[in-house]
């Protein structure tokens, strides 16, 4: 089965990595809109337009399913993309919410949503969590993580300063942290380590990873089986420098 994966840049690699590990598909077309990253600082109308343009990009590739591996686009453009598509278009928010529903039984557990400014302002996660009965939800726009990750700054003083800036003011320590941007799993270990060290936690918070969540969602909703395709083919495209994107993919995905 041939599918597409769409993201604003390299953040979708976290989803792609999970898909490749699960071996669900034999061919994956990855499109990163790297010329216009980040999406998280742009207005909803612009993001919807970017989503529709991504649909146009994938049409000649004759894919059977499109994964929107971008939380901002999933929050603001998914519905519009689904209206204009003849194939299934799947976002990353619903799978993440269902993963929480499976793993977090305490409806009063403190949940922290990390995301871009646009994702947080959309209230997509907050509303979906409240519909599932979760009452103790807070959110934090951590948009500065995106350009750092796009520049491959995955550790060191800059990232530490950024985490300190965002996390020091937290008044309630979360038991669950939603990595509400597909860039963020690329620094998940650093986020977990920061919480453990600076808040003296005995156990780390549960991190909800879009990539892992969407693999389980696809298996349940599209009758897909793990390890069905041992050697999936991956093809990379970008609105910006595709050579740079491929280089990042080789480094991060070990292709």
Swiss-Prot record:
<dbReference type="InterPro" id="IPR015942">
    <property type="entry name" value="Asp/Glu/hydantoin_racemase"/>
</dbReference>
<dbReference type="GO" id="GO:0008360">
    <property type="term" value="P:regulation of cell shape"/>
</dbReference>
<protein>
    <recommendedName>
        <fullName>Glutamate racemase</fullName>
        <ecNumber>5.1.1.3</ecNumber>
    </recommendedName>
</protein>
<comment type="function">
    <text>Provides the (R)-glutamate required for cell wall biosynthesis.</text>
</comment>
<dbReference type="InterPro" id="IPR033134">
    <property type="entry name" value="Asp/Glu_racemase_AS_2"/>
</dbReference>
<feature type="binding site">
    <location>
        <begin position="7"/>
        <end position="8"/>
    </location>
    <ligand>
        <name>substrate</name>
    </ligand>
</feature>
<comment type="similarity">
    <text>Belongs to the aspartate/glutamate racemases family.</text>
</comment>
<dbReference type="InterPro" id="IPR004391">
    <property type="entry name" value="Glu_race"/>
</dbReference>
<comment type="pathway">
    <text>Cell wall biogenesis; peptidoglycan biosynthesis.</text>
</comment>
<keyword id="KW-0413">Isomerase</keyword>
<dbReference type="InterPro" id="IPR018187">
    <property type="entry name" value="Asp/Glu_racemase_AS_1"/>
</dbReference>
<dbReference type="GO" id="GO:0071555">
    <property type="term" value="P:cell wall organization"/>
</dbReference>
<dbReference type="GO" id="GO:0008881">
    <property type="term" value="F:glutamate racemase activity"/>
</dbReference>
<feature type="binding site">
    <location>
        <begin position="182"/>
        <end position="183"/>
    </location>
    <ligand>
        <name>substrate</name>
    </ligand>
</feature>
<keyword id="KW-0961">Cell wall biogenesis/degradation</keyword>
<dbReference type="GO" id="GO:0009252">
    <property type="term" value="P:peptidoglycan biosynthetic process"/>
</dbReference>
<keyword id="KW-0573">Peptidoglycan synthesis</keyword>
<dbReference type="Pfam" id="PF01177">
    <property type="entry name" value="Asp_Glu_race"/>
</dbReference>
<feature type="binding site">
    <location>
        <begin position="39"/>
        <end position="40"/>
    </location>
    <ligand>
        <name>substrate</name>
    </ligand>
</feature>
<feature type="active site" description="Proton donor/acceptor">
    <location>
        <position position="181"/>
    </location>
</feature>
<feature type="active site" description="Proton donor/acceptor">
    <location>
        <position position="70"/>
    </location>
</feature>
<feature type="binding site">
    <location>
        <begin position="71"/>
        <end position="72"/>
    </location>
    <ligand>
        <name>substrate</name>
    </ligand>
</feature>
<keyword id="KW-0133">Cell shape</keyword>
<dbReference type="InterPro" id="IPR001920">
    <property type="entry name" value="Asp/Glu_race"/>
</dbReference>
